[in-house]
Amino acid sequence: MTDFLPTGIELSYLVAASLFILGLKQLGSPATARQGNSLAAVGMLLAVVATLLDQQVLNYQMIFVGLLIGSIIGAIAAYKVEMTDMPQMVGLLNGLGGAASALVAIGEFWRLIGTGEPVTLADTITIILGVLIGGVTLTGSFVAFAKLQGLLPGAPMTFPLQQPVNALILIGFFVASGYLILTPTNLTVFLGLVAISLVLGVLFVLPIGGGDMPVVISLLNSYSGLAASAAGFVVMNNMLIIAGALVGASGIILTQIMCKAMNRSLTSVLFGAFGGSSKPGTAGATGSGSQDKTYKSVDAEEAAMMLGYARSVVIIPGYGMAVAQAQHSVRELADQLEGKGVEVKYAIHPVAGRMPGHMNVLLAEANVPYPQLYDMDDINPQFDETDVALVIGANDVVNPAARTDAASPIYGMPILEVDRAKHAIVIKRGMSTGFAGVDNDLFYKDKTMMLFGSAKEIVAQLVSQVKQL
């Protein structure tokens, strides 16, 4: 039995890794996402049970206390947290994953200097990487959470000489790392590395605007995976290495996909302070130019008539729908329209909202049928034949300036081509700009009608008016 145990544990890890891969594959489609999530959860349970059978485990009581506390907190969070708060939840979970990895590295360092065992170069490097990636993920995710929750301003937060200061701090980390490699039991230097890692995480996310939060959340998710993988090397656990590598790789791929959807490089997201206030006189900036433009507005009754007597309607959800928690009202409106013979579709932009798949998650929670959800590339050719495009709280992702104005900061960004529809109704609180800080040309087109108010209240009014048609 004793001889079989190590082999059995490794085989369990192999099965768990296979379940993770299958789960990731099924998470790629809304129709199979729930099943994929369940497969990944079973894989994680198997990995945890196998690890608990390891003979190196010294204190089961502490482990089970931790599991109990964590499970209770997780269950309460899953029950209490609204779907509209999922970006904040994901940010916190990323941060906790980074914290766990950093604590593993810190614990291993403490063990090595406490037992007097010789510290190898490989030990030191893996511990440094675990502390760096884990620390950056922890504080970076908490800053992202604070921005999403409104505890910190969503706009980029910058200060003079910010990039040189960041560079100096990073150089300081590398210098201290080199010194720790030469003196691997130096506690003062090690604690300094921990502190620098935490500071770097804060400085990394502060200058990033709210419009880039989907990319940041995805990148931090990747970091949490890399941190777990580094922790796996620290404690020589193959399952941690594999699982962390899967999360890290998938997160990086998703980050690149989202950057492509915004027509921006990752470096411009991290260092460009996108979404800050526009300079006066720059193309696309708000100012006197936008004040000279005119727009048309409608009330809920007129908008309901346009929707109710249309043959085809495409709904474009955005962050405004998430903030107003209007997804259930939107589903009810779609049901009413379909009952009158209107064909209803949903157009999803990859970076709409505040996390990857934000709109998909909200619409799934409202039980919107998966076949009605269309990606940007699939729906854009259909706008020419669409009678009414209903924009709910989306801004930059439907701005035609991205296609027509070479001077605009969002020029080249793939958008949902709502301006090609026969008519457009835009539900919005006011005429303010999106996170890119540029005016939206769509709002001033002859075919566009502005319907002002909170998304949830306005959609509820539309439902009531459509019922009366």
Describe these PLM feature segments.
Residues 18-32, 71-90, 141-156, 200-213, ...:
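C-terminal ends of transmembrane helices
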